[in-house]
Swiss-Prot record:
It is found in: Nucleus. GO terms for cellular component: nucleoplasm; nucleus; SOSS complex. Its main location: nucleus. Keywords: DNA damage, DNA repair, Nucleus. GO terms for biological process: DNA damage response; DNA repair; response to ionizing radiation. This is SOSS complex subunit C. The keyword Phosphoprotein does not apply. Component of the SOSS complex, a multiprotein complex that functions downstream of the MRN complex to promote DNA repair and G2/M checkpoint. The SOSS complex associates with single-stranded DNA at DNA lesions and influences diverse endpoints in the cellular DNA damage response including cell-cycle checkpoint activation, recombinational repair and maintenance of genomic stability. Required for efficient homologous recombination-dependent repair of double-strand breaks (DSBs). It comes from the Eukaryota.
Amino acid sequence: MAANPPGQGFQNKNRVAILAELDKEKRRLIQSQTLNNPGASIPLSRPAVNKEFRDQAEQQHIAAQQKAALQHAHAHSSGFFITQDSSFGNLILPVLPRLDPLE
């Protein structure tokens, strides 16, 4: 096993001290900004209500796309199709009929 160089312990302590000082300065700056600008502590992200509304609108858009794809498939194909969520992003899936085996 190789021994650590003599100056490496000093370098590690120096790095830890620098990081601690930077962290302290960062906290001080954040605290002074929130005291000077009380509105700065307001989160910039939108509330969950907007996210739920966006998700609902997205689902309605997908449902409309599925309906259009299903109508197109029925009009231009002799096969059977259903709307179902697919792992591969397909809006509609073909349905294969089950045939009774011949005896």
